[in-house]
Amino acid sequence: MNIFNNNLHETDKEINEIIKHEKLRQSSVIELIASENFVSPAVLEAQGSILTNKYAEGYSGKRFYNGCEEVDKAENLAIERVKKLFNCKYANVQPHSGSQANQAVYLTLLQPGDTILGMSLDSGGHLTHGASPNMSGKWFNAVSYGVNKKTYLIDYDEIERLAVLHKPKLLIAGFSAYPRNIDFTRFREIADKVGAYFMADIAHIAGLVATGEHQSPISYAHVVTSTTHKTLRGPRGGLVLSDDEEIGKKINSALFPGLQGGPLMHIVAAKAVAFLESLQPEYKSYIKQIISNAKALASSLQERGYDILTGGTDNHIVLVDLRKNGITGKLAANSLDNAGITCNKNAIPFDETSPFITSGIRLGTPACTTRGFKEQDFVSVGHMVADILDGLKNNKDNTKAEQQVLHKVTKLIKLFPFYD
């Protein structure tokens, strides 16, 4: 058998069908998962290229394998482009994920048992910032900060109090569900006060930072981590940035050979393509549209009587607090899914329900903005979401509302392009 003549349809009909059905699903739903986006065909092409065949342990010019001349060029391009994008001196584009980017920082700056201070999960933080089930919560003495009980905004005075009390080796800024801007200047001031390193995880807001729509942490944080998907609209992966090149050298060693073996060169190449796309003028317009769309979505839900956490949003995330409505996040997300609107259940600060149930939902605008949605479209989406939530308040069986909204979703989504 000559494998070079085989295509997916001939080789594996089952996987081929799964991909076809997933493409149909993605094309026909309103995608509101805040951490998802649609990459360009160019990114897909690079990610599915023959670079997947190449093993390239090490770094450009210092590989443990021969034959790396072309993949060296690809990695060098990715590094130079992302350094230009974020205006920084150091970048590592090899992390397989944002989690591994964070782990590389921990391996560089910490010893087991050191104290870290990060945002709690229920306040919008990420697993890798010290949550007890995660290695960051098992290997280190993890202390958590939260948000103000009245405003649901980050309480910087509380962070400072905890930092003075616990003397963390590392202070972490970043979130997976927080709709407001972060004051990186204040974080660095707190870190300096207690002699801590400061790490900014900008996985969700990387696109906003790159385009100047959010304060950049590069001048304040000792090290910055991010994913390359979400608002950067690249392949799934991670990266590490810094203006401290000495820390950068240590991070290189921590990542390889400390955490990973060979980098995924097809992913690195796809990252390079995404970074090039992000350097184009139209990308700034895209990020501005993401934010405008999120504000429109939040306002439309507020007009329908739903509580938006913090009263609005500064970024791409809208958090809906359903506690006063007697609806769980799980029930809402499942009913929306039935109606062709995909989002995720999400904990609300000081949430007393299980993380598998939750009292809220998280909505995001990057994916549908990529498809061309504008403010008026997200106003319509907000009303569709509210129709489903209204139905859940009044009926145990929400089939009627789901069918009505699904018809509207189908009509709207057909107006916007998808992959051929």
Swiss-Prot record:
Modified residues (N6-(pyridoxal phosphate)lysine): 230
InterPro entries per the UniProt record, alphabetical: PyrdxlP-dep_Trfase, PyrdxlP-dep_Trfase_major, PyrdxlP-dep_Trfase_small, Ser_HO-MeTrfase, Ser_HO-MeTrfase-like, Ser_HO-MeTrfase_PLP_BS, SHMT-like_dom
Listed Gene3D superfamilies: Aspartate Aminotransferase, domain 1, Type I PLP-dependent aspartate aminotransferase-like (Major domain)
One Pfam assignment: SHMT
MF terms (GO), sorted A to Z: glycine hydroxymethyltransferase activity; pyridoxal phosphate binding
GO cellular component: cytosol
CDD domains attached to this UniProt entry: SHMT (cd00378)
Pathway where this protein functions: One-carbon metabolism; tetrahydrofolate interconversion; Amino-acid biosynthesis; glycine biosynthesis; glycine from L-serine: step 1/1
Positions with a binding annotation for (6S)-5,6,7,8-tetrahydrofolate: 121, 125-127, 246, 354-356
Major localization listed first in the record, in broad terms: cytoplasm
UniProt cross-references to NCBIfam families, sorted A to Z: PRK00011.1
Family: Belongs to the SHMT family.
Function: Catalyzes the reversible interconversion of serine and glycine with tetrahydrofolate (THF) serving as the one-carbon carrier. This reaction serves as the major source of one-carbon groups required for the biosynthesis of purines, thymidylate, methionine, and other important biomolecules. Also exhibits THF-independent aldolase activity toward beta-hydroxyamino acids, producing glycine and aldehydes, via a retro-aldol mechanism.
Protein name, UniProt field: Serine hydroxymethyltransferase
Organism: Rickettsia akari (strain Hartford)
